[in-house]
């Protein structure tokens, strides 16, 4: 949904669907998948990533990343685009590192990857991947796991998730790595701000 989220009376509101659609930035952040695909095709893009959150039953403790690419798990179908799996794999360790560190605990896939072809996972290609550019959709966490949803409301946490994808992209292209670090964590004491 629209980001950055705005607090109302010190809390983040739970919008009804109608209220959500009436937000000023709704159209900006909720474009048709066909529009996104047209933009990808028209702009000579060489790396596509679509960042999302996943859903299960509200209040669940299910929480893990899922990378989905066009094609099949065996990377042998005519639908597969060369480089899809490799791009996912380059980012997996960095994204999964956030979860295995305990900052955003993972309920599954701690010791193995979760990189899947849409053809096997869903039986069809997701609308946002119906273009001819190599890349993937990533479900970084489950927003129905309440701690993950609240972390996603924090711009610093979103920056950290973005850094994970950035580092994977740098690895994929073999580019020079950054030479600075980031100190990230959580404060669990009301007296320390």
Put a short name on every predicted segment.
Residues 1-180:
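Active-site-proximal helix/loop segments of hydrolytic enzymes
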Residues 186-193:
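Structural motif
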């Amino acid at each position: 949904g629209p980001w950055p989220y705005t607090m109302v009376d010190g809390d983040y509101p739970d919008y009804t669907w109608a209220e959500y659609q009436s937000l000023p930035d709704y159209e900006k952040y909720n474009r048709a998948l066909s529009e996104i695909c047209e933009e990808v095709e028209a702009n000579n893009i060489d790396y596509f990533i679509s960042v999302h959150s996943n859903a299960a039953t509200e209040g669940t403790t299910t929480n893990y990343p899922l990378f989905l690419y066009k094609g099949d798990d065996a990377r042998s179908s005519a639908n597969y685009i060369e480089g899809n799996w490799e791009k996912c794999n380059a980012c997996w360790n960095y994204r999964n590192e956030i979860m295995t560190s305990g900052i955003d605990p993972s309920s599954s896939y701690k010791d193995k990857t979760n990189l899947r072809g849409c053809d096997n996972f869903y039986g069809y290609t997701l609308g946002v991947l119906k273009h001819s550019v190599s890349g993937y959709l990533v479900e970084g966490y489950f927003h129905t796991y309440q701690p993950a949803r609240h972390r996603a409301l924090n711009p610093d946490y979103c920056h950290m998730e973005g850094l994970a994808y950035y580092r994977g992209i740098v690895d994929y292209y073999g580019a020079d790595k950054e030479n600075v670090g980031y100190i990230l964590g959580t404060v669990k004491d009301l007296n320390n701000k």
